[in-house]
């Protein structure tokens, strides 16, 4: 996310891209959704989930349109550079050469589509992978670019804090209990406090912090180096994730089918909407990774339809996961990390399955943590980078990795309330990335495209929400969400 134009990579079919996008969106946020559903009530949760899914789809089409406009501008600049080079090389050309060049220059002054020969690619074809940072540099002024990177950095800090808390929290829940020897995990009516004993004199919070320290020592050093997620590791973690989700849904359905469901969720409870909103926004987050995902798709003819199909499938999956959870488990017994509800012997008889589900977040999150950390570090470098300048070795190799790693670890040290961490990250930084940035990107790219190519040029990847009303509506919704969440937090604190 350093904001550069990067290699497109190996091409894949549109349906493979659909699967990749599904895997990208459905992540850690899905594991915190059941508790948020139970807290806010099933009807309010369903309505908000569908509406936020629709809003995420709208801004996803905005980003795709901006990607196409960025590709067209890059092609136009390459044509201009080529013309300048040809002008320099032909300064001593004959009169006939001059005549040919004059004709070419007159053609260059027409809109770009008029100089496209038959069979040449559409100027708005998405072939160059232009990351969001580069699009911000193309369409925003300096203040806008800095605000973009600030928003991305805050979101990535929240991401790392969630990851840093989720792994030790899962390990603590699996290995600790009130008595210290209960291998079946959390019982239905058991409420644990951080001060309860874990092993001998060690409290649960002590075990959590020990696991956090081990997690930081093992994965923190990767922040100081370059690391990327390999194809095979991605396949392995995706396979583990879908096995875990499938097992949880099936187990919950079996209990409900056998009339063992304990959940009686309310219809609506507006006190839980704040966290639900943040969790849902976080769970639909994909806009910042769309360039890496969409560009390698070989055929983009029906791209918008495929993206819409993906969102429908994701909505159905989130609904199935959350509704089976809230009707299978009592609302007060649902854990921040849904997998931990299956650590009970009366839910899962096989110890291997209990430990797999309990430790599943540990494996998947541990593979993502170094990637997110390196991405955040690179964004810090890009934010402070000056043209032609280089960083001293200490700043480049020590300062930037340190300011990347320390804050999220400190947040995780202070709290392991995953629902609140996900809610706040989604409600603030998530709102900026998912709503504000795409809306401003598409607004400025449309204006620049009209100036550069004329009114008659059509962007083949233009969003179906092409009226300016939708840009204003998205920004108004983002502002309303910011006010609502902030007011809700303030009112909640004053009641304590």
UniProtKB/Swiss-Prot annotation:
Keywords: Glycoprotein, Membrane, Transmembrane, Transmembrane helix. It holds the Pfam family Aa_trans. Residues 32-36, 168-204, 255-276, 328-354, 419-421, 492-496 are extracellular. Coiled coil: none annotated. It is found in: Membrane. Glycans are attached at residue 193. It comes from the Eukaryota. The keyword Ligase does not apply. Its main location: membrane. GO terms for cellular component: membrane. The chain crosses the membrane at residues 11-31, 37-57, 147-167, 205-225, 234-254, 277-297, 307-327, 355-375, 398-418, 422-442, 471-491. It is a multi-pass membrane protein. Residues 1-10, 58-146, 226-233, 298-306, 376-397, 443-470 are cytoplasmic. Belongs to the TMEM104 family. This is Transmembrane protein 104. It comes from Pongo abelii.
């Amino acid at each position: 996310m350093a904001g550069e134009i990067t290699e497109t990579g190996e091409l894949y079919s549109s349906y493979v891209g659909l699967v990749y996008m599904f895997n990208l969106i459905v992540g850690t946020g899905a594991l915190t959704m059941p508790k948020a559903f139970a807290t806010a009530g099933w009807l309010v949760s369903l309505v908000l989930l569908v509406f936020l899914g629709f809003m995420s789809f709208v801004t996803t089409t905005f980003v795709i349109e901006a990607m196409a406009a960025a590709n067209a501008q890059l092609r136009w600049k390459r044509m201009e550079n080529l013309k300048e080079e040809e002008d320099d090389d032909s300064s001593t050309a004959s009169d006939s050469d001059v005549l040919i060049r004059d004709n070419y220059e007159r053609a260059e002054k027409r809109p770009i589509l008029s100089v496209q020969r038959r069979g040449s690619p559409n100027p708005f074809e998405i072939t160059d992978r232009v990351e969001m940072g580069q699009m911000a540099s193309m369409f925003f002024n300096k203040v806008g670019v800095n605000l973009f990177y600030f928003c991305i950095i805050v979101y990535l800090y929240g991401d790392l804090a969630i990851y840093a808390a989720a792994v030790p929290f899962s390990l603590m829940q699996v290995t600790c209990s009130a008595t210290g020897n209960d291998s079946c995990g959390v019982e239905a009516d058991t409420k644990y406090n951080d001060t309860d004993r874990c092993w001998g004199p060690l409290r649960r919070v002590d075990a959590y912090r020990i696991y956090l320290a081990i997690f930081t020592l093992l994965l923190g050093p990767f922040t100081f180096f370059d690391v990327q997620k390999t194809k095979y590791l991605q396949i392995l973690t995706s396979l583990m994730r879908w096995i875990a989700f499938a097992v949880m849904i099936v187990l919950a359905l079996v209990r409900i089918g056998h009339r063992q469901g304990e959940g009686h969720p309310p219809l609506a409870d507006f006190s839980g909407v704040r966290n639900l909103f943040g969790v849902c926004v976080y769970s639909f987050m994909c806009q910042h990774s769309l360039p890496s995902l969409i560009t390698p798709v070989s055929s983009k003819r029906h791209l918008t339809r495929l993206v819409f199909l993906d969102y429908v499938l994701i909505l159905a999956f989130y609904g199935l996961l959350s509704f089976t959870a809230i009707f299978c488990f009592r609302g007060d017994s649902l854990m921040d990390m849904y997998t931990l509800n299956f650590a009970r012997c009366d839910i899962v008889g096989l110890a291997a399955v209990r430990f797999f589900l309990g430790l599943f977040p540990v494996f998947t999150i541990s593979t993502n943590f170094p990637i997110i950390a390196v991405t955040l570090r690179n964004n810090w470098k890009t934010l402070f980078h000056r043209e032609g300048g280089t960083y001293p070795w200490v700043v480049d190799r020590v300062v930037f990795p340190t300011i990347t790693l320390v804050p999220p670890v400190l947040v995780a040290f202070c709290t392991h309330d995953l629902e609140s961490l996900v809610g706040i990250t989604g409600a603030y930084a998530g709102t900026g990335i998912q709503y504000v940035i795409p809306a401003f990107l598409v607004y400025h790219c449309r204006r620049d495209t009209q100036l550069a190519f004329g009114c008659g040029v059509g962007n083949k990847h233009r969003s179906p929400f092409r009226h300016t009303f939708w840009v204003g509506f998205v920004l108004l919704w983002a502002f309303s969400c910011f006010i609502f969440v902030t007011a809700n937090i303030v009112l909640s604190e004053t009641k304590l």
